[in-house]
UniProtKB/Swiss-Prot annotation:
EC top class named in words: oxidoreductase
Cofactor: [4Fe-4S] cluster
Name of the featured protein: Nitrogenase iron protein
PTM characteristics: The reversible ADP-ribosylation of Arg-115 inactivates the nitrogenase reductase and regulates nitrogenase activity.
Entries under Gene3D superfamilies matching the protein: P-loop containing nucleotide triphosphate hydrolases
The EC number(s) this enzyme carries: 1.18.6.1
InterPro entries associated with the record: NifH/chlL_CS, NifH/frxC, Nitrogenase_Fe_NifH, P-loop_NTPase
UniProt catalytic activity: N2 + 8 reduced [2Fe-2S]-[ferredoxin] + 16 ATP + 16 H2O = H2 + 8 oxidized [2Fe-2S]-[ferredoxin] + 2 NH4(+) + 16 ADP + 16 phosphate + 6 H(+)
Length: 303
C-alpha cells in the first residue's frame, strides 16, 4: 500500500459531486490505467451507479442489517466490480479498472449516517479491500455537514488529498470554505491536505474568475473548470459515465484532462479558509453580491 493514494471528493449537496467524481475516476481508469476502489460515503448511495450501470448499489449498512451484523458479511457481498470497461476481469485497454462499495446509513430520521461511514471503512480495511494492486482509493463524501462521521476520512487520515467540487454560486462557495475549515482542523494530526477545487460550472456570471479567486484565497488551485454540457445528463439517463457513453465528445476530453491533472497533481496544501465577511467581500468584488446594507434587508428588488 506504499504507493496507494487516498483521495476524497467533498462538496455541497446537489453540486454534482457524485457525477463529477465518477466521470473523473472513470477517465483515470480508462485512459491512465489506474486501479481504483470507490467508497461511497453519502447516504444517497449514488456514488457508484454510473460505474455499475445500476440504480443504486446495496450498501454495507443495508446488507449488515439483513444478515445481522457487519461481521457476518463477506467482502464480495459489498465490493462490486465495475461494469463494461471498468470490470477487473475485462479491464479497459489501458489496464485500469474500478471496484465499488457504498457505506450507506440508517433509516432517515434514525441514528447517525456518519457512523455508517466509520463502520464501512473499518470493515473494508479489515477484510483486505485496500489491496496492494490498487493505485487509488476514492471517498465520495457529503459535504454540507462536516460532522464527525462525515469528516472521518479527513479526521482519521484515510484521505490525504481532498478535492472540493464547487461552483460560482454563493452556497457552493460557502460549503467549500467550510470544508476547508475541516481540513485545516485535522491537517496537523492526520496529514490531510487540500489538493484543489473542481468548478462544476453552473454558468453564473464571471464563474471561472470567481472560482479561481476563491482557490487563491484558500491557498490552493482551481485544478479544473468543468463546463456545463447536456451530454452529462444524457449519459446519466443510461447510467453511464461520459467517457463510456461518448468517448469522442468534448466533455469526455474535459474529464480526461481533469483525470490527468489529478494523476499528476503534487500541489497539496494546508488551506487558509476565510471568515464570512471576507467571503462576502469576494462575492461583492466580482459583482455576485451587492454591498450589504441593513436597511435593504427584506426589501424586494427594484423594478
Amino acid at each position: 500500500m506504499a504507493g496507494l493514494r487516498q483521495i476524497a471528493f467533498y462538496g455541497k449537496g446537489g453540486i454534482g459531486k457524485s457525477t463529477t467524481s465518477q466521470n473523473t475516476l472513470a477517465a483515470m481508469a480508462y485512459y491512465f490505467g489506474k486501479k481504483i476502489l470507490i467508497v461511497g460515503c453519502d447516504p444517497k448511495a449514488d456514488s457508484t451507479r454510473l460505474i455499475l450501470h445500476e440504480k443504486a448499489q446495496s450498501t454495507i449498512m443495508q446488507l449488515a442489517a439483513e444478515v445481522g451484523t457487519v461481521e457476518d458479511l463477506e467482502l464480495e457481498d459489498v465490493c462490486k466490480p465495475g461494469a463494461g470497461p471498468f470490470n477487473p476481469e475485462q479491464p479497459s485497454p489501458s489496464g485500469g479498472w474500478i471496484k465499488c462499495a457504498e457505506s450507506g446509513g440508517p433509516e432517515p430520521g434514525v441514528g447517525c449516517a456518519g457512523r455508517g461511514v466509520i463502520t464501512a471503512i473499518n470493515f473494508l480495511e479489515e477484510e483486505g479491500a485496500y489491496s496492494d494492486e490498487l493505485d487509488f482509493v476514492s471517498y465520495d463524501v457529503l459535504g454540507d455537514v462536516v460532522c464527525g462521521g462525515f469528516a472521518m476520512p479527513i479526521r482519521e487520515g484515510k484521505a490525504q488529498e481532498i478535492y472540493i467540487v464547487m461552483s460560482g454560486e454563493m452556497m457552493a462557495m460557502y460549503a467549500a470554505n467550510n470544508i476547508s475549515r475541516g481540513i485545516l482542523k485535522y491537517a496537523s494530526s492526520g496529514g490531510v491536505r487540500l489538493a484543489g477545487l473542481i468548478c462544476n460550472a453552473r454558468m453564473t456570471d464571471r464563474e471561472y474568475d470567481l472560482a479561481n479567486a476563491l482557490a487563491t484565497k484558500l491557498g490552493t488551485q482551481m485544478i479544473h473548470f468543468v463546463p456545463r454540457h447536456n451530454i452529462v445528463q444524457h449519459a446519466e439517463l443510461r447510467r453511464m459515465t461520459v467517457v463510456e457513453y461518448a468517448e469522442t465528445s468534448t466533455q469526455a476530453e474535459e474529464y480526461k484532462e481533469l483525470a490527468r491533472k489529478i494523476v499528476h497533481n503534487d500541489l497539496k496544501v494546508i488551506p487558509t479558509p476565510m471568515n464570512m465577511d471576507d467571503l462576502e467581500s469576494l462575492l461583492m468584488e466580482f459583482g455576485i453580491a451587492e454591498q450589504f446594507d441593513e436597511e435593504n434587508v427584506g426589501k424586494k428588488a427594484e423594478a
